[in-house]
């Protein structure tokens, strides 16, 4: 199997459309869409599926995964729009468009270094804070929290993927068994994080989201 065998799947675009719609309805503060924030989890799941499919296809075709090429492709896809948005926000902030410039500087750094979700967790902010009325005018970069989690996944997962393949070869363990163990471990990660560090940690923290 090669990269070219991964054909376009319209059903995935349909899921994306549904996820976008419910998130937009949620942020529009429609009373009947209180669970719309779960659309973000759909995006994370789709990203994990697609990225893993690409890695599996590349490994099947070439016998390895070129992490540097993977990172380059992800950067070309994500960074241009992200940096344009950051630059525009900085220009508008310099013109006095936003309040709380100190916090905005912190948020810009969190977005640039792809740790925005950890910035939010460390500041003690909740998801309710970024969905409050007029929050977008006070914190124009809050949407970077989900992008940061995706970017962290993109950095880590190819290396973990290669490590798992090497482990399976050395131990003569089937990949399916190894994946099953990982699923079992991660299935309890989010509840444990929520129990020990609270529900906000389960929402912001990357390990809980990967789970």
Q: Predicted segment positions?
A:
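Membrane-interface helix/loop caps of multi-pass membrane proteins
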Residues: 1-211
């Amino acid at each position: 199997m090669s990269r070219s065998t991964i054909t376009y799947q319209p059903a995935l675009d349909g899921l994306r459309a549904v996820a976008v719609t419910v998130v937009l309805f949620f942020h529009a503060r429609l009373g009947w869409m209180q669970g719309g924030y779960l659309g973000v989890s759909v995006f994370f799941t789709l990203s994990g599926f697609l990225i893993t499919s690409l890695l599996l296809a590349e490994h099947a075709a070439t016998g390895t995964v070129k992490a540097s090429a993977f990172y380059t492709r992800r950067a070309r896809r994500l960074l241009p729009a992200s940096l344009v948005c950051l630059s525009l926000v900085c220009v508008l902030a310099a013109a006095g468009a936003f309040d709380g410039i100190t916090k905005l500087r912190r948020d810009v750094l969190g977005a640039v270094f792809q740790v925005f979700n950890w910035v939010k967790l460390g500041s003690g902010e909740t998801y309710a804070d970024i969905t409050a009325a007029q929050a977008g005018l006070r914190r124009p970069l809050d949407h970077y929290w989900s992008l940061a989690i995706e970017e962290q996944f993109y950095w880590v997962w190819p290396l973990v993927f290669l490590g798992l393949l090497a482990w399976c070869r050395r131990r003569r363990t089937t990949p399916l068994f190894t994946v099953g163990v990982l699923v079992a471990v991660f299935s309890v990660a989010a509840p444990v994080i929520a129990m020990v560090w609270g529900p906000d940690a389960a929402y912001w923290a990357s390990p809980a989201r990967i789970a």
